[in-house]
Curated annotation (Swiss-Prot):
EC number: 3.5.4.2
Enzyme class: hydrolase
Protein known as: Adenine deaminase
GO MF term (any one): adenine deaminase activity
UniProt cross-references to Gene3D superfamilies, sorted A to Z: Metal-dependent hydrolases, Urease, subunit C, domain 1
UniProt cross-references to NCBIfam families, sorted A to Z: ade
Pfam families xrefs: Adenine_deam_C (PF13382), Amidohydro_1 (PF01979)
Domain of life: Bacteria
Reactions catalysed according to its record: adenine + H2O + H(+) = hypoxanthine + NH4(+)
Cofactor: Mn(2+)
Assigned protein family: Belongs to the metallo-dependent hydrolases superfamily. Adenine deaminase family.
Name of the gene: ade
């Protein structure tokens, strides 16, 4: 049977325009469009699970939630028997970047709807760093066309750290103020320049003020373990949430200061288990805890899930199922001031609902959004037309020259036989890096890698303006044993090209290949291309289906394993090595950056 087109993508009428009709349905004066009978209602307001519940839906909104909805059933009413299964609110991802999935908003929705996600809060600061405000507008308009709720946060820090990197575009306070007038902008994206907030940087203060004046939410990003005065200054500046905590004390500190603690489980970030102890062991009120993914790889979405995976994981860490569900529904809705629209099964809200057979395992049988079934048995019921990205969003990789092996040479100080250098140390399953040091040999005047001790080379190649600039340094933690190089045009947040390799000729081949295909990620070994994921949209996203992208990404992962890299989601770790707002040591087009002091440092110690 052919899938139904997504003709229902338009949101239902506002509650105020539908109230009289909802009242009539609730009173039995008019029939519902859909009645789901005999369910166990997971009530996130009261914390109860209420058996024998019927749900009546009209015009895409809940009209009646209670026992025996026979009075709302008419000749045209569709009736579904839940058979005693759980009725759960549609899940919300409170903070995420679609681009991390390597796919478009449309493809991301196709992948996550069967997993019960019906609301997403996306921060498109990846495409903003490449295409600026027009790029944000493209993703905003695509989001509006989706059959689920995809709210957009206006990126706040483009570039993420002025003076320490150069992105493909810049956003201003005026841009933020303009975006706050767009229909689907929910607030300001994560304010990553936390030192700037604490120092009263006028750009940061201006963006936050424009957001608050618009009555919208200010997203946070405090990527520091220092909970002293800089933290207090950051909170006083206005950010309302934070997802960068990695310890229970981080979550507690944020909640005590009136922030929402967002606990993330992405493809490479495993921060829920440590922070949830603030609730399970510390007894902290869970109302101000929210679950999110931040960054999810396409393979994770296709094979493991999305917010259902996060809720399941939180339950495994000791949370009661209802509490975990609250952290992925009503808590999120209240934070974004949308509790009258989403986040619960209650009259007037959008009819976003899951039929779940096993609550602890989050086994989702059916997914409804706006009163329409979108998925059953893990498969989409509907088709979502592809969004047509213009030519201006493509061909964004501008190298300026053909790279050669010599572009990756690092000249040693004159007369040195050995040098001590700074090394970026990868931490598996975490976004921060370590600032390491290593003694490396000098061969023919050039600093050599130390493959035996897992020290290989990293290069950042400028790709927005065709300057031909290359920053060279060293990295440890990938475990590469053979001759190889991996290059990616996804390099948070400025999104130049990052190449990590043990062989300079392979490094040149990998970077040049990305220039040919318009961006993506590629792995070479001994002159041969082992895997390629093309991402022609801004050099960040594929225009193919999520399943195809996931298969290509799995081929990449397997090729990396054969080269000796056993890191969990090594590609995601690779893509963050230039993120100059998360400690400790990063690379940018400016040079090596010490993110504990926000200063450029020399490669040689």
């Amino acid at each position: 049977m052919a899938k139904k087109p997504a003709a229902h993508a338009t949101k239902p009428k506002p509650w105020t325009e539908m109230a009289t009709h909802l009242v009539d349905v609730a009173m039995g004066r008019k029939p519902a469009d859909l009645v789901i009978r005999n369910g166990r209602w997971v009530n996130v307001h009261s914390g109860e699970i209420i058996a024998g519940t019927d749900i009546a839906i009209a015009g895409g909104r809940f009209a009646y939630c209670g026992p025996n909805a026979s009075h709302a059933i008419g000749q045209g009413t569709k009736v579904v028997d839940a058979g005693g299964r759980y009725l759960v609110p549609g899940l919300c991802d409170a903070h995420m970047h679609v681009e991390s999935g390597m796919v478009t908003v449309t493809e991301f929705c196709r992948a996550v709807i069967p997993h019960g996600t019906t609301s997403m809060f996306i921060d498109p600061h990846e495409i903003a760093n490449v295409l600026g405000l027009p790029g944000v507008r493209l993703m905003h308009d695509e989001a509006v066309a989706m059959p689920i709720n995809v709210h957009v946060q206006m990126p706040s820090c483009v570039p993420s750290a002025p003076g320490l990197e150069h992105a493909g575009a810049e956003l201003t306070v005026a841009d933020v103020a303009e975006a706050m007038t767009w229909e689907n902008i929910i607030g300001l994206g994560e304010v990553m320049n936390f030192p700037g907030v604490a120092a009263n940087d006028p750009v940061m203060s201006g963006e936050i003020a424009a957001t608050v004046r618009a009555g919208k939410t200010v997203g946070g990003h405090y990527a520091s373990r220092d909970l002293g005065l800089p933290f207090h200054g950051y909170v006083a500046g206005g950010p309302e949430d934070d997802h960068e905590g990695t310890r229970a004390e981080d979550a507690i500190a944020r909640v005590r200061q009136g922030m929402k603690a967002m606990l993330r489980l992405g493809s490479a970030w495993y921060d829920v288990a440590s922070q949830i102890k603030a609730v399970t062991e510390g007894g902290i009120d869970p109302r101000n805890f929210i679950l999110c993914t931040d960054d999810s790889h396409s393979g994770t979405l296709v094979h493991e899930g999305h917010m259902d995976r996060v809720v399941r994981h939180a339950i495994q860490q000791g949370l009661k199922p209802v509490t975990a569900i609250q952290m992925a529904t009503i808590n999120t809705a209240q934070h974004f001031r949308l509790e009258r629209e989403i986040g619960s099964i209650a009259p007037g809200r959008l009819a976003d609902l899951l039929i779940v057979s096993d609550l602890a395992a989050m086994t989702i049988d059916e997914v409804y959004a706006r009163g329409v079934r979108l998925a059953k048995g893990g498969k989409l019921d509907i088709d979502i037309p592809a969004y047509d990205y213009p030519k201006t969003a493509k061909n964004t990789v501008k190298l300026g020259k053909k790279l050669r092996a010599g572009d990756f040479d690092i000249t040693a100080p004159k007369g040195a036989n050995e040098v001590r250098v700074r090394v970026i140390g990868v931490i598996e399953n975490q976004a921060p890096t370590r600032a390491l040091e290593a003694d490396l040999p000098v061969e023919d005047g050039l600093v050599a890698m130390d493959r035996r001790n897992d020290v290989c080379q990293i290069a950042l190649v400028e790709r927005h303006r065709g300057t031909g600039g290359v920053t060279n340094a060293f990295v440890s933690g990938f475990g590469y044993m053979g001759d190889c190089a991996m290059a990616s045009s996804v390099a948070h947040d400025a999104h130049h090209i990052i190449c990590v390799g043990t062989n300079k000729q392979d490094m040149a081949l990998a970077v040049n290949r990305l220039g040919q295909v318009g961006g993506g990620v590629v792995l070479f070994s001994k002159g041969k291309e082992l895997a390629l994921v093309e991402m022609p949209i801004a050099g960040l996203m594929s225009d193919e289906r999520a399943e195809i992208v996931a298969a290509k990404a799995e081929k990449l992962t397997e090729a990396m394993r054969k080269m000796g890299c056993s890191l969990n989601n090594a590609y995601m770790q690779h893509s963050l090595l230039a993120l100059v707002v998360i400690p400790e040591l990063r690379i940018s087009d400016v040079g090596l950056i010490d993110v504990t002091t926000f200063q450029k440092v020399d490669l040689f110690v």
